[in-house]
Amino acid sequence: VDYRSFSTEYDLLNNFISWWMIESNTPEVVTGWNSKLYDIPYLVRRIDRVIGEKLMKRLSPWGLVTEDETYISGRKHLCYDIGGISQLDYLDLYKKFTYKSQESYRLDYIAEVELKQKKLDHSEFDTFKDFYTKGWQKFVEYNIKDVELVDRLEDKMKLIELALTMAYD
């Protein structure tokens, strides 16, 4: 883990975009748990709002970031297509390729079922805002643990490998 500290969100996002734009750092595929409806929209909107649309479009090697709407259970969600980068949401892959229904599709539940591991507990905080403002170190560890759980799910299940094989065969 490469942890960097910044005094402002502007500096953080500028540094991230500068790092991302280095060709060897730009991914061909991004993944995460519910990344299509949470992580990517959050990142795109924060970059757009804090440092501007021009730099937000640099997330795409082609300068093409488009907004789309999807409806789940009648509720509208915004998602973004980042041209030149495939988004393989591990939650979607799990639902598509594991032919069994689960009582919950939260990462914590699926990690327990598949890996016998759980997310880092943060129940001592009343709200998520309290968590990241009053327990910063644990908040960082919580996010790292989430990434590790998705990585371990892929190590075990090979769903990204399967999706890529199906796409290119």
Positions of PLM-derived features:
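A conserved hydrophobic secondary-structure block that centers on an alpha-helix together
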Residues: V1-R45, R49-K54, T133-Y142
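Conserved "right-hand" nucleotidyltransferase catalytic core of DNA-directed polymerases
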Residues: L59-S60, L64-D169
